[in-house]
Every structure is written in C-alpha cells, then in structure tokens.
UniProtKB/Swiss-Prot annotation:
Family membership noted in the UniProt record: Belongs to the nitrite and sulfite reductase 4Fe-4S domain family.
The keyword Acetylation is annotated on this UniProt entry: no
Entry-linked PROSITE patterns: NIR_SIR
Organism (species): Salmonella paratyphi B (strain ATCC BAA-1250 / SPB7)
Name of this chain's protein: Sulfite reductase [NADPH] hemoprotein beta-component
Residues the entry annotates as binding [4Fe-4S] cluster: 434, 440, 479, 483
Broad EC category: oxidoreductase
Role this protein plays: Component of the sulfite reductase complex that catalyzes the 6-electron reduction of sulfite to sulfide. This is one of several activities required for the biosynthesis of L-cysteine from sulfate.
Subunit comment: Alpha(8)-beta(8). The alpha component is a flavoprotein, the beta component is a hemoprotein.
Details of cofactor binding: Binds 1 siroheme per subunit. Binds 1 [4Fe-4S] cluster per subunit.
This protein's UniProt keywords: 4Fe-4S, Amino-acid biosynthesis, Cysteine biosynthesis, Heme, Iron, Iron-sulfur, Metal-binding, NADP, Oxidoreductase
GO biological process terms held by the UniProt record: cysteine biosynthetic process; hydrogen sulfide biosynthetic process; sulfate assimilation
Any one GO cellular component localisation term in the record: sulfite reductase complex (NADPH)
Pathway: Sulfur metabolism; hydrogen sulfide biosynthesis; hydrogen sulfide from sulfite (NADPH route): step 1/1
Length: 570
C-alpha cells in the first residue's frame, strides 16, 4: 500500500493454525513434559513439535539416511537442534568448556556450530539428552529461551574489538533489550529446570498470550561496521557516539530477507529509518516497536506476518507515529552515520584499552577436529588458559577477546598449532553459508557442505582474471528462508532443488542493497560460467575501488532493487 492509501491496521480473517496452537499451549507448555517421557518415538508429537521452538529447539532428522531408514520401516533418526541465547555473542571461557564437553559427549555430530546470529548451536541432540542440555546451560548461566519461533530472537551487537568502551556500552544495551523482551512464562523453568509450578496464571505484558505473529530480530550496530547486517533485521539500534561515548541510537525498522519461491507477495526488504532517540528511551521504544508489530502484524498468513509487511501495509509514517505514541516520545532527525565494511578483521587487533583481540576465521562456523586441523581441541585449550572472554561474530567467526600482552604469544602458539590461524583468501573470508543438509528439514540444496569447494572455484576465476586478492561478498542459503543472508550479498545463491540455485546479483559490500534474481534454477557449472564471464568484465571495466555488486549495477548487467515491495520480482 502507498503512504497515501494505507491498508488496514489489522488483517481480518481466519487465523493461522499457529495462532490456535499458541493460544491452547498454556503459555508454551503444551504437553512437552509428558512427551519427554514417551520412549516409543525419538521425536515430539503434535503441537509439541512446534512448541519446542519457543524453548530454543528444532526437531530435525538426518536427511542423508532418511530413505534408508524408511526402507527398513524405521522412523527418521530424530534429533534436536538447540540454539543458545547469547546477546552480542559474548561467552566466558568457563561456559565454552561446558559446551565443548556437552557437544563431545551428548550430540551425534560432536560439533559446535557458530551461527551468523552470534550464538552457537548443537546439532544431533537425542531426546534423552534434551533436558540435560538445558540443565547444563543453566548451570553455567546460559539458556535457550526465545531463540526460535515467534519471539524476539538472539539480539546481535557489533563485534568491535578496537573501541572497547563503546563496545562495552553497546553490548550492555543488547543484553538489556534481550532481557526486556523475553517471555515471562514460567514454562521454560518448569519443564527443563524442574522449578515448582505455582498456582498463579502467567502473564505476558509485552508479547501477549499468543506471542508475536512471526519471528522478530533485533540488533545493536556500531558504525562504521555493519558486520551484523542490520538490514536483515526487524529492529535496529544504530549507535551514535560523541567523544567515544554512546549518547543515543538511530532506529531502523522493517528489514528482513526471507521469501518464498514464486510467491510475489513475499520479498526481501531493507530497514527504514525512523529517527534518533536518546539512550534513556531505548527500552520504551524497543517495547513500542514490538507491541505495535504484536497488535498489527498479520496473524492470518504467516508468509506475510513479519514486520516488513506490516510496515508496507499500514505505511511507514503510521507505524512510526504509533511507536512514538506508545513510547511517549518524538523521534529526532536521524543523526549522520556511515558504513565502511562488514567483514571481520582476521588476526590480531590492539584495543584502545591496550588489550589484544584475536579474530579467528572459522569456515562456516563449524567447530570440529578435522584431520590435521583440530580446531575444537585448540579452542578448548585456549579456553583453559584465557582470562578474557570469547565473542562469536555475525560472520560465524570467533574472537579471543581481551588478551593481555603477557598471554599473547602463548595463545597465538596454541592457535597456530591447532590450525586456527591458517592463511585464508579474502574471498573465503567474505563467503558464508547456512547449515542446510543433512540436518535442516527446509533445505532444498546444499549450502555449508557446498561452499568450501565452490569458493575454491571462484578463487580460481579471480586468479584467472588477474585479481586474486579481490573478493565478492558471496552467500549461499539452502532455501529461500534466507538464513545464509544471500539477499544482502553481491553474489547470492538460493537453493531451489538438489544441485540447483537461483542466482542473485547487485547487492553491495556494505549490505545496504537487496540483490535481484539474475538466473533461475541453474547448476553449479552454469553458475561458474556466469561468474567467469562477469568477473572477466569486472576485472577489465571496473572503476577504482568498485566492488563487484556495484559494478554489475553500473554496467547494466542487473537493475538495482529500489523499492522491494514493488520491484523485487520485476
């Protein structure tokens, strides 16, 4: 809808079945506790299959062996993914040692998976180990509450290892926002931590009895780094500093990347600027955005339920005015800010507090002991001696943060001895994939297992055209839900079918433009043929400092997406 002719504030019609499930769940309890004791199946049944997502878990199975098990008349090998709540990605070394042990002892795959939402996931948790994982997390001060489904997910915060004071302030706000928007139900504590049930009725003053219409994602961003890809998120607080001290935030609302193949009512969208707010209004504004989306978001069609669609339906000014009314403020004009990068600075960086920070490249975020590269063991050994913390980045890498000069050599030796500091190309540093096969039930094509060898081939193309040190921001996502953030890449691959992808071009290096579909449903060899041709032109015709995405737009290879609600599919 246009701003002159906005649509209805509330979408009338038959509610989706997810709304029925939430209403009947007794504040997210369902019959999960009873289901845990059912040894006849390795999975959760009925509504519980979806309700466990509010508790930070997804039920999955190993798709590599699904057909084999079906032929043997066996149910799929059900196992859970658990995603930790870890605002800003900061984790202590004590916590790291605990999660390392659990991954080794109690998961099928034995790995820790860093995600591009600054947390970690366990894959392959059998039903018998589901309660123990929650209790292990609780024992070290962690939880998995609200890391999935219709809530405010893990809050991101720029991993700035240099501006230590600014990072500390922004990180505290990320934690405060996360805590403020958490569900108040006691279901999590009752089911997983055996806390006693009390007679009083639960209340959800912010989220409501049926929670949000859809997932909701929040970031705290410290320019000039856009490492957290703010335009993938519903609500973004862009830090504004004076003399190195945080004074307030610019608010941007309504970003989101997920689409559905062929559904032209869906589109990726960048976030819209609302205005500037002083620090003291941060929580009130966060709550106002969330409750406006709670009340106005589409509960009849989950494909059109995210904040980006609400904003387009009611109009930006209407949504903004309602946030101002609920928060009791008037936004000031946006303060100046700019982004100059979004990758991680791999290697050592000295902070202004004179501590050192070592950013380690972790390909696809998968921490495991590989032949000749025992990454998992190396990080465990570092965790045993490091006095600071670890920080997970939104690029699926890991920072060994706050290393004193006296410990630097020792930690570097451990990192080098375990293959954690092997040289990597600029192209590999700027490539990312979601998990996809074999564990993700939504996967249509390979992503994490596909990317390393595909990157090799792209590197060879860059070398062939005389630009081996250049890079393309490249993302692969196994389905159009977009976890790999391909819709903010210069070259984005979106899984369509096994071995086939839609190719999107025309994003930029800063992550501020949505790429457009260039070719549909093509194979790896066809993709590489296109990349070879395009990189050849880029190498010869580019202007000084011009990135691949900007070149494809300027050269007329692809039209830029200017207004996604209207021109994303053109």
């Amino acid at each position: 809808m246009s701003e002159k002719h906005p649509g209805p504030l509330v979408v009338e019609g038959k509610l989706s079945d997810a709304e029925r499930m939430k209403l009947e769940s007794n504040y997210l309890r369902g019959t999960i506790a009873e289901d845990l004791n059912d040894g006849l199946t390795g999975g959760f049944k009925g509504d519980n299959f979806l309700l466990i997502r509010f508790h930070g878990m997804y039920q999955q199975d190993d798709r590599d062996i699904r057909a084999e098990r079906a032929a043997q008349k066996l149910e799929p090998r059900h196992a859970m993914l658990l995603r930790c709540r870890l605002p800003g990605g900061v984790i202590t070394t004590t916590q790291w040692q605990a999660i390392d042990k659990f991954a080794a002892d109690n998961t099928i795959y034995g790995s820790i998976r860093l995600t591009n939402r600054q947390t970690f996931q366990f894959h392959g948790i059998l039903k018998k180990n589901v309660k123990p994982v929650h209790q292990m997390l609780h024992s070290v001060g962690l939880d998995a509450l609200a890391t999935a489904n219709d809530m405010n997910r893990n809050v991101l915060c720029t991993s700035n290892p240099y501006e230590s004071q600014l990072h500390a302030e922004a990180y505290e706000w990320a934690k405060k926002i996360s805590e403020h928007l958490l569900p108040r139900t006691r279901a999590y504590a009752e089911i997983w931590l055996d806390q006693e049930k009390v007679a009083t009725t639960d209340e959800e003053p912010i989220l409501g009895q049926t929670y949000l219409p859809r997932k909701f994602k929040t970031t705290v961003v410290i320019p000039p780094q856009n490492d957290i890809d703010l335009h993938a998120n519903d609500m973004n607080f862009v830090a504004i500093a004076e003399n190195g001290k945080l004074v307030g935030f610019n608010l941007l609302v309504g970003g989101g990347l997920s689409i559905e193949h062929g559904n032209k009512k869906t589109y990726a969208r960048t976030a819209s600027e609302f205005g500037y707010l002083p620090l003291e209004h941060t929580l009130a504004v966060a709550e106002a955005v969330v409750t406006t989306q709670r009340d106005w978001g589409n509960r009849t069609d989950r494909k059109n339920a995210k904040t980006k669609y609400t904003l387009e339906r009611v109009g930006l000014e209407t949504f903004k005015a309602e946030v101002e009314r609920r928060a009791g403020i008037k936004f000031e004009p946006i303060r100046p800010y700019e982004f100059t990068g979004r990758g991680d600075r791999i290697g050592w960086v000295k902070g202004i507090d004179n501590n050192w920070h070592l950013t380690l490249f972790i390909e696809n975020g998968r921490i495991l002991d590989y032949p000749g590269r025992p990454l998992k063991t190396g990080l465990l050994e570092i965790a045993k001696i490091h006095q600071g913390e670890f920080r997970i980045t939104a690029n699926q890498n890991l920072i060994i943060a706050s290393v004193p000069e006296s410990q630097k050599a020792k930690i570097e030796k451990l990192a080098r001895d375990h293959g954690l500091m092997n040289a990597v190309s600029a192209q590999r540093e700027n490539s990312m994939a979601c998990v996809s096969f074999p564990t993700c039930p939504l996967a249509m094509a390979e992503a994490e297992r596909f990317l390393p060898s595909f990157t090799d081939k792209v590197e060879a193309i860059l070398e062939k055209h005389g630009i081996p040190d250049e890079h393309i921001v490249m993302r692969v996502t196994g389905c159009p839900n977009g976890c790999g953030r391909a819709m903010l890449a210069e070259l984005g691959l979106v899984g369509k079918a096994p071995g086939r992808y839609n190719v999107h071009l025309g994003g930029n290096r800063m992550g501020t433009r949505i790429p457009r579909m260039y070719r549909e449903n093509i194979t790896e060899s066809e993709i590489l043929d296109s990349v070879d041709e395009l990189v050849g032109r880029w190498a010869k015709e580019r202007e000084a400092g011009e990135g691949f995405g900007d070149f494809t737009v300027r050269a007329g290879i692809i039209r830029p997406v200017l207004d996604p609600a209207r021109d994303f599919w053109e």
